[in-house]
Amino acid sequence: LGALVPRRIENLLAANKNIGTTHITNGCYRLHPVEWNIGEAAGSLAAFALDTGRKPKDVVEERGLLRQFQRGLLADGVPLSWLLDVPVGDPRFDATQSLVMAGGYGEGTGALEFGPDLAIGPDERSRWTAVQWVVT
C-alpha cells in the first residue's frame, strides 16, 4: 500500500506502472492481473480517504486506520494476501487474512498456503494468540 502513496506529495495516489517499485520487483508489477489489483487498491484507498476525511498517507502511517481500511476490504471479499487454500467465500477467509496481515503467520516465508486443516503446535498457537488485530 505504501508504494501507492508518494512521500512528498499530499493527496496523490500512484496506480499501475507509476507506483514506487524497484527494477527488480517491476517484473511482477507489470503483469495485467497485478496492475488491476493495484488499480483496485488505489481506488479503494481514495474512497476510504474521502469517507473518513483522512489523507491516504494517514492510512499507511496509522496502524488503527490501516486496520480499519483492511477490514473494509475483507468485508468486500478483497484478499489482502495470496493464500491459495483459503479462497474468498471460505468461512475462514477473514480470520486467516487478518492473521497474515497482523503478522501472525507467514511473515518472511513467502508461503502461499495457510494449511487451515492442519493441526498447530504450542509454539504456533502462542504466536497466533499474541497477534494484535485492532478491533475498533
Specify the residue positions occupied by each region the protein language model found.
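Non-catalytic terminal regions with compositionally biased, polar/charged low complexity
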Residues: 50-89
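Internal hydrophobic alpha-helix adjacent to the cofactor/substrate pocket in enzyme cavities
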Residues: 36-55
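Glycine- and acidic
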Residues: 20-32, 49-53, 106
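FAD-binding beta-loop-beta segment adjacent to the flavin cofactor pocket
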Residues: 1-27
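Short, solvent-exposed alpha-helical surface patches in non-cytosolic proteins
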Residues: 90-103, 109-136
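Sec-exported extracytoplasmic/periplasmic mature domains
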Residues: 47, 51, 74, 78, ...
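Composition- and surface-driven signal marking solvent-exposed, interaction-prone regions
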Residues: 25-30, 44, 55-62
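Secondary-structure capping and boundary motifs in well-ordered enzyme cores
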Residues: 8, 31-38
